[in-house]
Amino acid sequence: MLAAGGLLTTLIYRRENYDDAWFGELAYFLATEGVIRSGLFADMLGWGDQVLMTHKLLVVLTALWIKIWGFSLYTVKTVALPFVALQVFLFYRYCRQSWMLCALLYLSCGVIVRYTFVSRPEIAMAALGFLSWQSLQQFRENGRIRWLLLAGMSAGATALFHLQGAVFMSAGAVWLLWARQFRGTAIYSAVAFGTFLLYFTDVVYYDAWDAYFFQIANDPATTALRSFSEKLFNLAEIPKIMLHSGGETPLTLVMLGCLFLRWKSKLPASDLEKYLLVLALCFAVLANRMVHEYLILFVPFMIAFSAETLDRMASERGSGEAVLFPKTVRWMNVLVILYLVAGVFYDGKLLYRNLQAEPLSKRNARLSQIVGDEPTTVIAPQSFIFGNIERHHIIGLGYYHHYNSYHTEPLTPEVFFEDAKRKGVRFVIFERNPITAEYKPPEDLPEVMADYRLIHRDERFRVYQQAPE
């Protein structure tokens, strides 16, 4: 309960994230207009009409959340919370002897604390991937097809959240082949792939295949795809994301300690260890890039493995049946305690940073007073959509961050303001130190640019207004 409470307190004044605005906007238009589109990036790859390449199930669930609670930063940020609860339930169901330790390690894990309240799909994908693994285990134990169907559907659903979910689809199939379950592999693969095909529902409905292939070929998120030989080097990148920061490193050290403990105790490799190995190999081959957020996909498995190992060592030590190494066990106990201390520190650090920052609602309210209530077109930071998307057409500064990728003419301040004039923009809001990838003009930008004049400046923002004709 304390770990859950600590996690929930980090939602207080939680700062906005780039993805909160991006997926929040897509979900807003789906909820209000019935189509996934973007105003922030309207002139990019046809996204102003329709976004066909995105984390679709995340957007759909966020749109449903908006229908229930209304559009706000906190609505967008809490979509993953039910999947955190699902993950804890799955620990209870799978790790009966050690589920409380699993839940404690999970809710105290820095990377989980950080991304539970960010509009990203990895938390949900990890929970569904773990459900798929549990179902595969059940199928292997009793042979009932219903578990195979559930495994395939949950693995396919991870790919509806993010195309990287193909990692779970592939890992399940490879693990079944390893277990010589050939018929099961065929059924599982068919169900998983059939579920994944739902991803193309909107593409088929609008007969938008040309637009889809154009977007997937030019999207900055997919152009990092590399050759097969280069992907093999992804294996060498996995340790980097496992030790990326204080959010990932403590869990990595606990898992490595448990691996060492199992090796010293000469315990045979468990099915979970085999699945983790398969998952890592599939990830190395299929992932288009290595970012630390993707470690979340492994977290439930790392925790289940660590908790099972610690619980087994404790029970066998009590029975006197195992060959134990007291010093190693003691060091593992110390490591787990340090892990929990690190989790408390991470919670506190995040909460402190949140409280130090000016709340987004106040910041946007201040900017809204400058812009006014009359509907108009504004170029602004992505997060300006919260509290303003209902009134204004907002073009994101993030669009201009990618401007040079899609235009032959280099983006200079003069080109920027000419483009703003061409789009009928009335206000331009620049942020001095944006926390996301957004266009930032020179600090010595003149007070008059084209038809725009500087009307407001403070320690964070500069606002330009188009002069009346």
Where are these regions (language model features)?
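Membrane-interface transmembrane helices that cradle and orient dolichyl/undecaprenyl
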Residues: 93-98, 130-150, 158, 260-267, ...
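Short periplasmic/luminal acceptor-recognition loop of GT-C membrane glycosyltransferases, typified by
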Residues: 357, 368-405, 417, 425-437, ...
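Loop-to-helix entry region of an early transmembrane alpha helix in multi-pass inner-membrane enzymes
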Residues: 56-60, 64, 68-86, 115
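Hydrophobic, aromatic-rich transmembrane alpha-helices
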Residues: 86-90, 176, 244-269, 274-282, ...
